[in-house]
C-alpha cells in the first residue's frame, strides 16, 4: 500500500440520484438537481444507515468543475447538512472534464484540493471508456493526488486492474454492464431483450476476479420478465419469474 495512513478511508453505501432522475414524490418542493432534493437524499441516507450520497452529472458545467456550478445547488450548505447527519457527499466528474484525458496537472490538483477543503469526501470519475497506458497512468496519478487530500474515488467506465491494493482510496470500478442498463433496455416481442438474472450471476466472474465491481444495484421495484418495462425515471430490475 502506498498510503501510510489509511484510517480516513471509509467504504460505504450511497444513495444515488441519477438512478431515478431525482424523481422524489411527496415533497413540498420541486424535485430536481437542487439543494432541497439533496437534503432529502441526505435524510434518506441517514434514516437507512447509508454512508454517502452522490451528486451525479449536472451539478457543474462540462467545461469547469470550479466556476460553472449550478446555481440551484449549494454545496457548502449540503456538506454542512450532511455533517450534521453523518453523511458524506461524493461528486460526479467525467475523466476528460477533470483531467483533459491525460496526466494530472496542477489545475487538476487544485480542483481536488478545493473540494476536499470544502468537505467533499470523494469523486465518482466517469467515462474513462479505455484501459490503455494513458488511462492507467492517469488513474495512478489521480489515486495518488486524491489520497494526498484524503479523497475517495469510484471509477466508472474502467475495469479493475489491481491498483486498489496500492491505493485503497479507490473503492470501486464500474467496468460492467450494470443495473442502470435496465433504464433503456430494449423490449422485443413484449419482453426485455437481455436476460438480466442470468447476467447477474455471471458478471462477477468476468469483472470481480481482480477487484470490486460497481454494478450500481438498488432497484426498489422488481418485475417479472413479462411485465418488465424500461422507464427512465421509474426504473425497475428484472426477476427470475416469467
For each predicted feature, which ranges?
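Conserved structural scaffold segments of CAZyme catalytic domains across common CAZy folds
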Residues: 1-86
Amino acid at each position: 500500500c502506498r498510503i501510510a495512513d489509511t484510517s480516513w478511508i471509509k467504504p460505504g453505501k450511497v444513495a444515488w440520484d441519477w438512478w431515478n432522475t431525482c424523481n422524489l414524490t411527496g415533497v413540498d418542493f420541486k424535485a430536481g438537481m437542487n439543494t432541497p432534493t439533496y437534503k432529502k437524499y441526505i435524510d434518506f441516507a441517514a434514516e437507512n444507515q447509508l454512508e454517502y450520497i452522490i451528486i451525479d452529472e449536472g451539478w457543474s458545467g462540462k467545461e469547469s468543475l470550479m466556476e460553472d456550478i449550478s446555481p440551484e445547488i449549494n454545496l457548502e450548505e449540503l456538506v454542512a447538512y450532511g455533517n450534521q447527519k453523518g453523511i458524506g457527499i461524493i461528486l460526479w466528474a467525467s475523466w476528460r472534464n477533470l483531467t483533459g484525458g491525460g496526466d494530472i496537472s496542477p489545475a487538476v490538483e487544485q480542483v481536488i484540493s478545493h473540494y476536499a477543503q470544502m468537505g467533499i469526501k470523494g469523486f465518482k470519475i466517469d467515462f474513462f471508456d479505455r484501459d490503455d497506458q494513458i488511462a492507467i497512468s492517469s488513474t495512478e496519478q489521480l489515486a495518488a493526488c486524491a489520497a494526498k487530500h484524503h479523497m475517495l474515488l469510484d471509477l466508472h467506465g474502467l475495469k479493475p486492474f489491481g491498483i486498489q491494493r496500492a491505493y485503497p482510496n479507490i473503492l470501486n470500478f464500474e467496468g460492467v454492464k450494470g443495473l442502470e442498463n435496465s433504464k433503456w433496455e430494449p423490449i422485443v416481442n413484449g419482453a426485455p431483450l437481455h436476460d438480466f438474472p442470468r447476467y447477474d450471476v455471471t458478471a462477477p466472474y468476468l469483472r470481480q476476479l481482480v477487484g470490486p465491481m460497481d454494478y450500481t444495484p438498488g432497484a426498489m421495484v422488481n418485475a417479472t420478465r413479462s411485465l418488465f418495462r424500461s422507464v427512465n425515471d421509474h426504473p425497475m430490475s428484472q426477476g427470475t419469474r416469467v
